[in-house]
Design a protein with these regions (language model features):
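Short, helix-capping/interhelical loops that line the mouth of catalytic, cofactor-
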Residues: 1-5, 53-99, 158-163
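Hydrophobic secondary-structure block in the mid-to-C-terminal portion of proteins
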Residues: 124, 128-163
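Hydrophobic, well-ordered secondary-structure segments
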Residues: 3, 8, 15-19, 28-29
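Alpha-helical transition-metal enzyme core signature, strongest for iron centers
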Residues: 10-17, 40-55, 84-86, 92, ...
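Acidic interhelical loop/turn segments
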Residues: 21-37, 104-138
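Long, hydrophobic, amphipathic alpha-helical segments used as structural scaffolds
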Residues: 55-58, 62, 110-117, 153, ...
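Short, solvent-exposed segments of well-ordered alpha helices
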Residues: 1-4, 34, 38-41, 93, ...
Length: 163
């Protein structure tokens, strides 16, 4: 996949997510999920946090600290929980701003990347990442991630939390 194709795929799937979010009112964005956990606004923060992780990867910074975690956990569920704990009381506006700012900053960096950049191996602290190229975390933390959360958000809307 060329760099332009990567960016086009990111932009298309991101727009699908943004369009979905635009159909949800404030009450829907802040209501807990069917299991009583993450609200839709928490999904936005989560996506933004992983975009911060990806941005830090390209900038050579500590990815976990860039997400706002303690940097002391390395299991994905623990990382996600730390991010949620830190941001769960954020307002809808704060969650949106975090989501939008992370994406803007990431896309500014990705705009400069070439196909060769995406094809280079990347260093990772995750055990299962040996030998993967930069395209793998780019896909996993952008268009594949958006698609995953689009599905969950649609499920949440179909089956809201019991009040």
């Amino acid at each position: 996949m060329t760099a332009d194709e990567v960016r086009a795929r990111i932009n298309a799937k991101r727009q699908e997510l943004v369009d979905l979010i635009a159909t949800i009112d404030a009450a829907g964005l802040s209501a807990p999920g069917p299991d009583g956990s993450w609200a839709i606004k928490d999904h936005l923060v989560h996506i933004g946090a992983w975009e911060h992780w990806l941005l830090a990867l390209f900038e050579g910074r500590n990815e976990l600290l860039a997400m706002g975690t303690s940097g002391e956990v390395n299991e994905v569920d623990d990382i996600n929980n730390e991010v949620w704990q830190r941001h769960r009381d954020d307002s809808i506006d704060e969650a949106r701003r975090y989501f939008e700012d992370a994406h803007r900053d990431l896309m500014a960096v990705l705009a400069e990347k070439t196909t060769e950049d995406f094809d280079r191996p990347y260093p990772s602290s995750f055990d299962n990442a040996a030998g993967l190229t930069f395209l793998t975390p780019v896909a996993a933390n952008t268009y594949e991630h958006y698609d995953e959360h689009i599905g969950w958000i649609k499920e949440m809307r179909a089956k809201p939390a019991q009040r």
